[in-house]
Amino acid sequence: MAIVRLTRDRIEGDPIMIVVRCLACVVASLTVSALGVTIDYTTIENPGNGSNTNGWGAVSSSYRLATDETPNAQYVEFLNRIDSAGINPNGIYNARMGSDALGGITFSLAAFSGAKYSVKAGTNPNTVPYGNAPVVFVTWFSAARFVNWLGNGQLASAASMEDGTYTLNNQTSGAIPPRNQGSGVQVALPSRDEWYKAAYYEPGSAHYLMLQGTNTITQTTVLYAANYGGDATPTLGPIAVGSYVNSTTPYGLRDMLGNVIEYTDTAGAIDFDVGRPQVFSGSWATPVAEIGFWNVNSPPIFRGATTATGEIGFRVAEVQAVPEPAVLPLCGVGAAIAVVVARRVRRGITSFPSLARRVLSFDL
């Protein structure tokens, strides 16, 4: 309709300008649909598996989890699409992403609309190009907004990050909200059980495996490699995506031990941890003596939802939504729309670092 109005309004004007403007509209629409975040998902099968001895890891349906952690380059796409004017709604950009050596994203109010945010030039303290390093200095709420935006089709609208899998309504602190019930597929942060199964469960068996690595970042092609150790080793920050090519979980995911701590959407329910997200993995800064506390048999660890450090990031999941208690049948156009929405293609990631494992005696 915009093109029709333009043609009608300018019919007495320069016909070349009319054609140019019409073509600009077409190109703009094609550009928006062609660009964006593309997630490399790994399918986690074996639905209905049993839990580990700690009660974690049982998942009733198949789901998909990003093979790698979310990188700076993808978060930049999100920032520019959501915030073309550079007003930073609900603090989705943390200034330390630009000022801290571990952060990988810069902001310039003087830049063109839709290009206010960019991947930082150069490399991080681990000599990793910033675009390939996991995004850090993100709160749980910023990570939740990222997945809401993905699930809503990567729209150029700040409203698209406030509702979806999580109803945020401009919330930036406090207890994390639960996933919304619904139908079809949701883009989400993984739950405790989804993350745990993808990291440790051996498909088709009754075993949960231990991820075990070295802390020497030069050994990127050996088995059982991971990025941890902090300042005591050369691991001075997150490493390049896809570095540990021979170290994966049983399902083939990377960096589920070390590199960055990862948020889940499972909230604590006891004492000080009520409403705080459970986290996994450990990070590049986790001391060698403490990395075992982040493995298969570790106790539950929680972080504040507003925590934003150079050690914490996230990865994306695609899961089956939990049905609402009573869903009225749809008909006609409403049903058609529901089918289209449920089948929307959700895309987003590239490649990243890795891990490894060793069988323990955690038989069910």
Segments (PLM) and residue ranges:
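C-terminal membrane-anchoring or membrane-association module
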Residues: V339-D363
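Disulfide-stabilized, aromatic/cysteine-rich ligand-recognition loop
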Residues: L35-G36, N246-T249, F272-V322
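Sec-dependent signal peptide recognition
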Residues: I18-C25, V327-L330
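Functional-site microenvironments in short loops/helix caps that host divalent-cation chemistry
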Residues: W140-F293
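Short, Lys/Arg-enriched N-terminal segments with co-localized hydrophobic residues
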Residues: M1-I16
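A short, hydrophobic C-terminal helix/tail in secreted or cell-surface proteins
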Residues: E324-A342
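N-terminal signal peptide c-region/cleavage motif recognized by signal peptidases
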Residues: T31-S33
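A short glycine-rich, aromatic-capped structural motif
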Residues: V37-S108, P134-G151, G258
